[in-house]
């Protein structure tokens, strides 16, 4: 209940609102504990940065997964995937790297597209929502992306804010890896 008010807490804690962050995190953890029946069911979080925050704050009871990790562990063996004839760009966001799940992203992309270009960058520089206020961080973090993604028709990642900056600086549209999986399984 009241799902639209739930938040991983990063928006609060990253700005120094520790108490508000703890309240938001505790409220989300309790809601997910109930929804997952005390960890009986896995929980998918579509944003890697939010998942990283949740994993840092929550106890061990709830099984939390990021998009590509969830797809490779629970979906791909149940789906009929056809490899799309295109060259795509792939960006593993910072939090996915910190959780060491970027290989799931690459594995999923390679199941869905003929050619996958993995962007070589440690960080896009968007830094949560800081890219809105300090766009030069994002511009600097992605200063080489246009060359690296040359010839790619589109790009995929696991963080909407990162995807905003990636789209702006690469010249191609970036979106969730789930869009690629959906298209590769469409009949």
Can you describe what each PLM-predicted range is?
Residues 1-187:
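Iron-sulfur cluster-binding electron-transfer modules in prokaryotic oxidoreductases
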């Amino acid at each position: 209940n009241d799902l639209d008010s739930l938040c991983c807490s990063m928006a609060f804690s990253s700005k120094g609102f520790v108490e508000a962050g703890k309240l938001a995190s505790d409220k989300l953890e309790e809601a997910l504990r109930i929804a997952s029946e005390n960890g009986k069911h896995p929980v998918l979080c579509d944003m890697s940065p939010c998942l990283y925050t949740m994993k840092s704050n929550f106890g061990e009871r709830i099984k939390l997964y990021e998009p590509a990790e969830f797809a490779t562990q629970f979906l791909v063996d149940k789906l009929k995937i056809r490899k799309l004839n295109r060259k795509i760009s792939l960006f593993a966001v910072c939090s996915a790297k910190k959780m060491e799940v970027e290989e799931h992203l690459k594995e999923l992309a390679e199941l869905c597209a003929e050619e996958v270009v993995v962007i070589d960058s440690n960080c896009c520089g968007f830094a949560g929502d800081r890219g809105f206020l300090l766009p030069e961080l994002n511009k600097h973090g992605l200063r080489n992306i246009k060359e690296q993604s040359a010839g790619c028709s589109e790009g995929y990642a696991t963080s909407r804010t990162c995807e905003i900056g990636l789209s702006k600086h690469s010249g191609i549209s970036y979106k969730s890896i789930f869009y690629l999986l959906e298209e590769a399984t469409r009949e």
